[in-house]
Design a protein with these regions (language model features):
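Hydrophobic alpha-helical transmembrane segments of membrane proteins
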Residues: 1-80, 91-254
Length: 254
């Protein structure tokens, strides 16, 4: 089972490898721009590089999620891709490989960008001592205004929440696309219906998470609320994965 999953994951990663190389190349260009400004002591270049890298990070994560969703949709629509679901591999293995591959891409990309910003920040703090004062003042301001202790542990949890939420959204997209291709296959406006269902699921999950935090007596954004959020989205992702695989298993095996 593990060997089959690994083969399927390699297949998924190979299909989307080229775009990741482009993302890596653009990120490296941003870093070259940053260190050029750093070496030449040009604050405008440093600021521009960090600003562009920030925008690119958000755009890259959006693109990775979008590409994963579109690849899955293509696999269900195109005959040569759809044949994958007719192989001896179970739909649970195939969908599992897709979910894990998407999760790996999101997590590794997020980690890579986070490390870049940590490295850039450390370099700046080492050279410009005044930034340490700004950093300390910013932490105090956030703590006073929002009652949030802005430490490294908290930032890591925030990054994890964002990445896990993206993985949940991708898996829910798989579910809605599968619904459109299976149980709604003969219905008019199936794409629109599945799109509406997707947004209803997103809103409902958000409300359910708020209710869960309220039920647990968590009224502030802190480490505990972030950990609960991560665990909640992991459970939602697992449920969406099982439901997606079940729907495909029922329809493809018929």
């Amino acid at each position: 089972m593990e060997e089959i999953m690994l083969k399927l994951m390699k297949y998924e990663l190979r299909k989307q490898a080229f775009s990741k190389l482009i993302i890596l190349a653009i990120a490296l260009l941003g870093e070259i721009m940053f260190f050029t400004g750093f070496i030449m002591d040009k604050s405008e270049t440093i600021g521009l590089a960090l600003g562009l890298l920030s925008l690119f990070t958000v755009g890259a994560l959006f693109f990775i999620a979008f590409e994963s969703i579109m690849t899955f949709q293509s696999d269900l629509k195109q005959k040569h891709s759809y044949m994958l679901f007719l192989t001896p591999n179970t739909t649970y293995s195939i969908i599992g490989a897709k979910v894990i591959s998407s999760a790996l891409q999101i997590m590794l990309s997020g980690l890579a960008f986070a490390l870049l910003f940590i490295m850039d920040g450390a370099v700046l703090l080492a050279k410009y001592s005044s930034l340490n004062e700004i950093n300390r003042a910013l932490k105090e301001f956030v703590n006073l205004q929002f009652n949030i202790n802005l430490d490294y542990k908290y930032l890591v949890l925030v990054i994890l929440v964002i990445l896990v939420t993206w993985i949940t959204i991708i898996t829910l997209s798989y579910l809605s696309i599968t619904l459109s291709a299976t149980f709604l296959a003969d219905k008019r406006g199936k794409s629109f219906i599945s799109f509406v269902i997707f947004f209803i699921m997103i809103i409902s999950i958000g409300k359910l998470e708020d209710f869960l935090l309220f039920a647990l007596g968590i009224n502030a954004i802190n480490d505990t609320s972030l950990i609960v959020g991560i665990l909640f989205h992991v459970v939602v992702t697992i449920i969406a994965y099982i439901t997606t695989a079940w729907m495909l298993d029922k329809k493809v095996s018929v």
